[in-house]
Amino acid sequence: MARANKVVLAYSGGVDTSVCIPYLKHEWGVEEVITFAADLGQGDELEPIRQKALDAGASQSLVGDLIEPFITEFAFPAIRANALYEGRYPLSTALARPLIARRLVEIAREVGADAVAHGCTGKGNDQVRFDVAIGALAPDLKVLTPAREWGMSREETIAYGERYGLPSPVSKRSPYSIDLNLLGRSIEAGPLEDPDVEPPEEVFAMTCSTEAAPAQPELVSIGFEAGLPVSINGQRLDPVSLIREANRLAGSHGFGRLDMIENRVVGIKSREIYETPGLLLLIQAHQELESLTLAADVLRTKRQLEMQWADLVYQGLWFGPLKDALDGFIERTQLTVNGSVRIKLHRGSATVVGRSSSDSLYEPDMATYGAEDQFDHRAASGFIYVWGLPTRLWAAAKRRRGHHG
């Protein structure tokens, strides 16, 4: 019995998603496979990918430009949330998955499909992100996961595709698995599976090495309005152009490389290489502006919730209730995050050297140690007495207990 009649397949042009097309038809009895490839600013020429799907047996091969919503609806909220999974990874790949899932569901409705499919394997994070997102948006649609179920090794998958005339894009010279979009690149597999092997320079494309970076530093000014980046060096840019320019500037100075051991959703550790120059630069600038414009208790609370926000997105819960609630809190905090931050880029580093805001909570007359100081130093004694009272009472009780044995 056929698993489904008409399926919309998330398609990248890679080995797994290409093999999914004949596999769905010949092994699972699917009558019609419609593929969808998302343009997320990865820079690939998508016409060959579209044709490749047709050659593999797809009845329709669709390509959609999702760059603008990717930045405005997914990347910019992540910047506001200072989203860094495990304190480092800015979710460049994870942010794309709920958007692709949403578009898959929309296409399925438009063409009358009874299922959607993806080529994610059973060890990765993306299977979780797609399955959970689709289940939230369209619980009536089946989600077919051939790569998770077919039980073939990488070599066997390639051989299966060759039976149906599919060429393999992976050679011995380039054994890496690469995912890319406008926000960055993720690189894994091959020699990188040994966590003690230094990544060769050939795996990087968006950033130069620190050795090849300019000897002279460059100052960059980033402007924000309500927590959203709006300008670079005084020039207002649309969201997509701003990300491109941030990538260019940071990448040209070797900033934005990550080499980390990451805890996947499925419980294993993986070694990941990331290039995310612009996104990391913007998050760093945004964090600094918040330190100037948010009250201390709000800032501390937000820093705690940012980690949870990043965990939720990484774990595929973009459309979940907790993230929705956190979005409301973050939105409220951003009303006063207005101003600019100056950052010095130099040979792999990005150092904040200045920040300014009309909503600044920094009061020079209170902070100065000069003659203009308006802080009432005499008030400190009473404050410290009350502040330290609980500690003194606890210490006294501890001494009494010790005295009586």
Swiss-Prot record:
It comes from the Bacteria. L-citrulline binds at Y89, N125, R129, S177, S186, E262, Y274. ATP binds at A10, Y11, S12, G13, G14, V15, D16, T17, S18, A38, G119. It catalyses: L-citrulline + L-aspartate + ATP = 2-(N(omega)-L-arginino)succinate + AMP + diphosphate + H(+). GO terms for cellular component: cytoplasm. Its main location: cytoplasm. It is found in: Cytoplasm. GO terms for biological process: argininosuccinate metabolic process; L-arginine biosynthetic process; urea cycle. Its EC number is 6.3.4.5. Keywords: Amino-acid biosynthesis, Arginine biosynthesis, ATP-binding, Cytoplasm, Ligase, Nucleotide-binding. L-aspartate binds at T121, N125, D126. Belongs to the argininosuccinate synthase family. Type 1 subfamily. Homotetramer. This is Argininosuccinate synthase. It comes from Synechococcus sp. (strain RCC307). The lineage of its organism: Bacteria, Bacillati, Cyanobacteriota, Cyanophyceae, Synechococcales. The gene is argG.
